[in-house]
From Swiss-Prot:
Belongs to the COQ7 family. It catalyses: a 5-methoxy-2-methyl-3-(all-trans-polyprenyl)benzene-1,4-diol + AH2 + O2 = a 3-demethylubiquinol + A + H2O. The keyword Iron applies. This is 3-demethoxyubiquinol 3-hydroxylase. GO terms for molecular function: 3-demethoxyubiquinol 3-hydroxylase activity; metal ion binding. Catalyzes the hydroxylation of 2-nonaprenyl-3-methyl-6-methoxy-1,4-benzoquinol during ubiquinone biosynthesis. It comes from Burkholderia thailandensis (strain ATCC 700388 / DSM 13276 / CCUG 48851 / CIP 106301 / E264). Keywords: Cell membrane, Iron, Membrane, Metal-binding, Monooxygenase, Oxidoreductase, Ubiquinone biosynthesis. Binds 2 iron ions per subunit. GO terms for cellular component: plasma membrane.
Length: 208
């Protein structure tokens, strides 16, 4: 059984890196049609932002996989799995949007995935309360990051905006779930380190 789970998670990891993840929910659609075509500069900027969001979802898959295997609680395993499935939708949605924008995922996805997997292993080994606290803080920072993207996306890019809005709603839910399950607040140095690492990732992934 464990071997089957390892094969399944390995497959998920490969799909995350390759950008061929499955979606269980359709791509969110805007309520109204775009008011105008995006200019070349707007398409390039939107693609950079969506590439950053795609990298975030690659990292989310790695984090949840590591945390799922680190816990001995069947309830928490299911919680991490449920969150990972919803994040896999995000991964597929952002990949779909990048293709629509004639762009591509980050060339550094294997590196992002490996780094996030290592962080998830460390968080998981510190115990369930810390692991859940790490999940909650991650989701809070992602929520803030998505808020900034909603303000930065071109006004005419209603397709990307619809995706980001649904992603944000899911992230808020995941963060609350982690807190309700017993996640503790991480110390300020840990939160600052997470923000610094996120800044490096987002600044790099926008271009690469």
């Amino acid at each position: 059984m464990l071997f089957d789970e390892l094969i399944s998670e390995f497959d998920r990891g490969l799909r995350s890196i390759a950008g061929v993840s499955r979606m269980s929910r359709p791509v969110p659609q805007p309520a109204a049609a775009a008011p105008a075509e995006l200019s070349a500069a707007e398409r390039k900027h939107a693609a950079g932002l969506m590439r950053v969001n795609h990298v975030g979802e690659v990292c989310a898959q790695a984090l949840y996989q590591a945390q799922k295997f680190a816990t001995s609680s069947s309830e928490l395993k299911e919680m991490f799995e449920h969150a990972a499935r919803e994040e896999e939708d995000h991964l597929a949605w952002t990949a779909h949007r990048l293709k629509d924008l004639d762009s591509r995922p980050s060339l550094l996805n294997p590196l992002w995935y490996a780094g996030a997997l290592a962080i998830g292993v460390v968080a998981g080994r510190l115990g369930d309360k810390v692991s859940l606290g790490f999940m909650a803080e991650t989701e809070r920072q992602v929520e803030s990051h998505l808020d900034s993207h909603l303000s930065e996306l071109p006004a005419a890019d209603v397709e990307s905006r619809a995706i980001v809005e649904q992603m944000r709603a899911d992230e808020v839910k995941h963060g609350k779930t982690a807190t309700d399950a017993g996640g503790i607040e991480l110390p300020m140095p840990a939160r600052m380190l997470m923000r610094a690492a996120s800044k490096v990732m987002t600044s790099t992934a926008y271009y690469l």
